[in-house]
From Swiss-Prot:
Gene Ontology cellular component annotations, sorted alphabetically: cytosol
Binding-site residues for anthranilate 1, renumbered to this chain: G84, N115
Enzyme Commission number(s) of this protein: 2.4.2.18
Keyword field contains Transferase: yes
Taxon lineage: Bacteria, Pseudomonadati, Pseudomonadota, Betaproteobacteria, Burkholderiales
UniProt-listed Pfam families: Glycos_trans_3N, Glycos_transf_3
InterPro entries named among the record's database cross-references: Anthranilate_Pribosyl_Tfrase, Glycosyl_Trfase_fam3, Glycosyl_Trfase_fam3_N_dom, Glycosyl_Trfase_fam3_N_dom_sf, Nuc_phospho_transferase
GO annotation, biological process: L-tryptophan biosynthetic process
Residues that, per the record, bind anthranilate 2: R170
Name of the protein described by the UniProt record: Anthranilate phosphoribosyltransferase
Amino acid sequence: MTITPQEALQRTIEHREIFHDEMLHLMRLIMRGDMSPVMAAAIITGLRVKKETIGEIAAAATVMREFANHVEVQDNSNFVDIVGTGGDGSHTFNISTASMFIAAAAGAKVAKHGNRGVSSKSGSADVLDALGVNIDLQPDQVAASIAETGMGFMFAPNHHPAMKNIAAVRRELGVRTIFNILGPLTNPAGAPNQLMGVFHPDLVGIQVRVMQRLGAQHVLVVYGKDGMDEVSLGAATLVGELRDGKVHEYEIHPEDFGLQMVSNRTLKVENAEESRTMLLGALDNQPGVAREIVTLNAGTALYAANIAESIADGIQLAREAIASGKARAKVDELVRFTQQFKR
């Protein structure tokens, strides 16, 4: 039984759930551009007001994956995405992007899915661009990049063309909607493992259970209690972990790993150029908060990728990748590899 957009809107007004098959139908209408902008705006606002359920988010992510331009990766072992929802308002340098280079240097394969900054001063696409990486690759070129360098960056607009059908609505609404949390759930390379940062503590338990429904393998969803969508040095971090089909929720602290709790204030940047400088400083093994926080996040990603037995082991591997110069060398390797596809 399909549901009309009007019926769906009424359901959200009454704070009742839209069922899985109904949500699939509604999302397909939106992604095809077959729903009027007024109805699309009303429904996604209604969902936000009543609070989206795990089932609704999982169905929406399923459709977004259907409509994506996929990257076919042959070998799925130790394959991870490091991503944040963004929108945490912290304006820090690109910690997850720096972590990608370290994780790849330690043997993970990383499919990073990102965009230019919307809420942040520098999105992952902005800082990679500033580093000299060609971010505008076709899906087969991204697959080649992952196979060759252990890293691939998927520029969201190239992989989710159907999003243009809702872009104007989202821009005009100007508030967070379900689409703000779908990005990290819709990796076009289908990475089975993930380190996902979220902008609200409630999303830790929600997003990890959505990933469970979507068939992911090893996922850590994190929220720093100082408001960061990363594993934080400035506070405890809430973790939702999916492993072997089961979800566990717990808290970790920097001191658990022999790290000092320090404010993230010094990590703030104004633009992609400042982010680039801080990222390279951390990878060049310059002592400081930037190096420590990327070590912590890359270590967590290596645990998610099943290269490390624990976060603590991952941190040790991350330290070695930085100290040996391998992590810094990965930047030059990705620049060289992607520049050959410059159009």
